[in-house]
Each structure stands twice: as structure tokens, then as C-alpha cells.
């Protein structure tokens, strides 16, 4: 019989007896009501909603505003600097982003609560941004405010950096990076958006163990655009094939070409850490020697819908433009 492990995720709550949980929820709820949607075409973005969010932050965290500086960088990115007492220590950077993606038109009725209601109901805060990722923006702010309100000071300078267009082109993050570089800032570490769930380690072969992934790396990416030109004309006379057929063939060739598969250092560390808790084969045996069985472990990951992106480079086809008429062959 396997005895299910039970973890008390609230064991340390007693360490903060005066933590204003209801107030923290209300402040996040108010932030959700700020419709900070950013579009690739920034002319469509309503920056007054970002102004509302900035005003809300300034009003909600008086101790941060008292000891720190609030700067708007670039268009509407935010950099809050909380100075440390020890100049010999390199500063740290806590990152997140203010912007959210729009609600897909026609799906508004599918939301249990309206996307920008910020409703607090059934033990949850509801709305766009509660998981991606205003909860991290306000989690960092709540933590810093709590420490400062209780007379604590920072030995190491802390930067709180909140981009305004992470969901589109990341100009806000770039502006913050350039601003810090111009000041000659060298960071000790960066804490950015990552996994925020506590869940069974089933994907790792440890279904009886609750895990929360700490993301140590960020993969790069590339956007590729393919254009094909052909003779064109009427669809009843597709001499030589159509542009779409040629493009489809190229896409098929690319998606069939495998990228390399390997276990990087972060995944190696993850399996080494989880090894005592992995109960399912073949991983249970393989993780007894993670380095020696790296290729076999990576192959197992390739068979998992949860783990395969961590051992190879995924490729996603997301858009094909369409002709203006069903009878027309695109050039």
C-alpha cells in the first residue's frame, strides 16, 4: 500500500499573524479592474488604464513610496528602487509585467466572472491577470510593504521592475535594462515570471509528491515568416501548383526536421533533486544515475506532453494568411 503524503502548505502562516490577507486580496482585485491590455499595435492600447494602475500602486503602498523611488521608464514600464544599506552588495531585481492579453471576442460569456471584474468569490480572485501575472506584481509589492511597515530595512538594494508590453514586444523590459545599464548597475540575481503552481509531480514520475517548479532558465525564441510567390490566376487553372501548396510543403519539411534532444543542467538538477521521490518506472531506475542516463531520461521527457519542451525546441505554426477570394490563386 502506498501511503499518500500530505503537505501542510499553510504551516508558516502563523509567522505573519498580522498579515492583512483581505486587504491584499482587495488590492489585487482593484488591479484586475484596470484593463491594462497591450496590443502589438500600440495605437490601440489604452494607456489611461496603465495610469490608473500606477496611481493604485502609489496609493496602496505608502511605505514603499516613502523609502523608494517610482519611475516610469519608456512608455509605461515601472521601475521602483528600494535602496539598500550596504553599498558593497550587488542589487537584486524582481520582475513581472502589468499588461494582459485581450479577451477573445465572442468568448466573454464563457467566463465564470467577467474578465475584468476582479470579483472575490468562492475563495478566489477572478479575472484576467490573476495568474498572468498581476498576482506576482502585487505579491512582490505586498511583501516589500509588509517588511518596511514592520521596521525592516533592505541590506541589498531591490529593484521592482514591471514591464508594460511583455505580451507583445517587450520594449518596456528593454527600456528598463538599458536604464540600469546606463547607471552601471550589476545585479546579484533576477527573479522573473515562472511557474506558480503547486501540483503532483506526476510528469516527473513522482505522483505522490507535491512539487513547485522553480524556473532557472529562459529559452530563447525566434519568429519565422515564410513568403511564397507563384504565377497566380484563377483556381481552375493552378498551373505549376499554388503558393499555398508550396508553402505547406515547406512547413511540412520544417516540422518533420527534428531538433536536438538533450537534458540541460536545469533539468539534470531537477531530476537529481526529485530522485528520492520518483516512484514510477522507467524514471525510478534511470534517475539513480542522472548523468549516465541523461539520453534515456531525455527520451522519456520527449514522450511527455508536459516535459518535452524542456528537452528540445518546439515549433508552432500559428498563422497562414488567406486569399481574398476562393476563386483566386494568391501570387
What positions do the PLM features span?
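Residue-level detector of conserved catalytic or cofactor/ligand-binding positions
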Residues: 316-331
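Active-site-proximal beta-strand/loop segments in catalytic clefts of secreted hydrolases
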Residues: 32, 82-83, 96-98, 162-164, ...
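Predominant activation on well-ordered alpha-helical scaffold segments within soluble catalytic domains
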Residues: 29, 138-141, 145, 174-177, ...
